[in-house]
């Protein structure tokens, strides 16, 4: 009697990360490993650790939060990018293509997690991408490899036997800003709400952090709220990185000048097409292109 055999099928992995705050010791090994692996310049980071001191002496504790791209299923940065430089791979990783990025910062403004930055060396957008180049060849991300307490886990959510799937299904985990509807794929275990919510902890007096000072706060968004605003006097940021507002006058100037450039070229073209000026007019053949090129530059 003939028998049939089930043909094995391969399922595309769905990569996700679990950050165990009950194990994190705030050592910054993940930050330095990420910088080394991805050649991230000074002054910018793909991942960083934030410290928040909670409570009053003698009952005080320090909470840590590892911050990075949340690999959203419905990624606002992908929707905002005008050149498709930000894109979501079939395996769930939100990746970027530096070769077509124009540095417009639309992705930075769209991201609700403060996870994207402009690389000062090539003026293109970067962020954590789970070390996709390592996952593609069967290696773990650099941060996962170096974490001394194994607080970072990356795995396939489509595999019920993966450590990430088991932790998500077994333990109480949360995501950042679920109200945004982005369906992030970075899950936090044992996280203190004062670290996940940028409005829950006040800045230290004078902007003086553990190891650094953040400059003129009038040009920064230190933790997502005005410098003196605070809804929890018992929660104080003790270490954070500068968070500059993604868009300033340069974006408005960029939009304004490029609009003039487009108009200077299109208006003479429309006038020529409608017969209001001859095709040989200097407004179309000379003045329009010159003005367009000046404002385009």
Predicted regions and their residues:
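Non-ligating segments of multi-cofactor redox enzymes
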Residues: 1-247
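Hydrophobic cores of alpha-helical transmembrane segments in multi-pass integral membrane proteins
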Residues: 217-297
